[in-house]
Amino acid sequence: MGFERAFVESSPEQENKLFVGVSYMDSSNKNQDPSESNNQISFGGQHQHHQQQFFYNHHQQQQLQNNNQVSFGMMQQSSSAIPGSLISKDSAGAYDLGELDQALFQYLDGQEPSSIQEQRQNSGMRPPTLNIFPSQPMHVEPSTTNKMNTGLVSPAISGSKRSSQPSMELSNNLKNNDAPSASGPEPPKAAKREGNRKGPTSSSEQDAPKTPDPKTLRRLAQNREAARKSRLRKKAYVQQLESSRIRLTQLEQELQRARAQGYYFGGNSLLGGEQNLPVNLANMSSDAAVFDMEYARWLEEHHRLMCELRNAVQEHFPENELRIYVDNCVTHYDEIMNLKSMLTKSDVFHLVSGMWKTPAERCFMWMGGFRPSELLKIILSQIEPLTEQQLMGICGLQQSTQEAEDALSQGLEALNHSLSDTIASDALSCPQNMANYMGQMALAMNKLSTLEGFVRQADNLRHQTIHRLHQLLTTRQAARCFLAIAEYFHRLRALSSLWHARPRQE
């Protein structure tokens, strides 16, 4: 059996005491209850109950013993502190402390010496030595089997515990310093294992997809939306190119049909001699050809919009739905005005000549388009009944439009007279003076450039008239108004077709 021994030095008033796995009370505490004293008895295993009973029965005998007691703790110090009369024998030598322990606990347990010897052999107990350097860390508790074999766990009083704790800490420090090879490499191994444990975790965290922040998600959504809009614009552009190609093919076919019908100048004409070019191709610019193609597309789209509007009016659509069709018509008129504005800058004579119109429409043209005042007279009877306020507004619009038309007409007439006078200012003889001729042509071109301004003002007047009607009329009245305008120009185009298809008299 293993024991834990401690050597305690007493104060001058007390003698040295002997503790064999237990602490005894002083003689001054004779009348006290042993259960309430600070001395505690701790025995391991199955012998604890017998040991407590023994010490209780022999309490009186222990008080009569000599006060000089030897502590089982440190072997060398205890031998110097024990009186010779107590444990010294004859010259043969001192009592062995292990034999004293064996005899004492043999008496306590009532066991045979042979059983004690077998128990010591089975437990592999080493000779009792000073256990300053424990073979195991202090915080590791021994197993229950070792406790059963050893039998006792030495108790100590509070004073001895306080005195033994610094010595235990010192022994632990000495153990750590003396045997670095035993405990030193273990923390690095543990750290290495921990690092190995953390390694896959960190790599897995790096491999795991990171959730982007809201700003990145918003940017990704914006990029996707921009890409989607770009694809839609590209698709619309491709469709527009395809439709333009189809329109160009149709225009070429119309030119071929016109050439087949005999729209040529004579062989000695001023526009190409014997080249036999059609009139509409002799002096047509590229901008004029594009405008004719876009105008043909605009006519088809206008016809579709008018069919939808007529269907909505006939089926008595609600006011809000009907307003959508009316707004589409106004927007469509704005589109043709923009096309004419671009052509005015590049080829104003193409607009004024009316080559993009049918012959019947050309008869009623005024400065590259219809007269707004005449249009108001036509539709006034088609949008009745009108309120008094609406009637006054339309009459005022008609009057202001008529005044603007008269002013533009007078300006255009003055331009024509001035241009004619400039050209005929010099003698109209064939061998003319080249210096005077070039001066007259430069002056005439300068005056002719004002024609662009007249055409632009006329288009603005037509545009304002359309929008003013849209504002004065209700939604249903505006729908009937646009249907009447579309039907009017459709009949003019039909008249031209009928005129070309009429039977020829010989």
From Swiss-Prot:
What are the start and end residues of every segment in region (Basic motif)? 215-235
Q: Which Gene3D superfamilies match?
A: 1.20.5.170
The UniProt entry annotates the motif Nuclear localization signal at 217-224
Q: Where is the composition biased (Basic and acidic residues)?
A: 207-216
Q: Please note every region of biased composition (Polar residues).
A: 25-45, 113-124, 142-152, 160-180
For the keyword Nucleus, the answer is yes
Domain bZIP: from-to ranges: 213-257
Query: Cellular location of this protein?
Result: Nucleus
**What is this protein's function?**
Transcription activator that binds to as1-like elements (5'-TGACGTAAgggaTGACGCA-3') in promoters of target genes. Regulates transcription in response to plant signaling molecules salicylic acid (SA), methyl jasmonate (MJ) and auxin (2,4D) only in leaves. Prevents lateral branching and may repress defense signaling.
Q: What is this protein called?
A: bZIP transcription factor TGA10
Organism field: Nicotiana tabacum
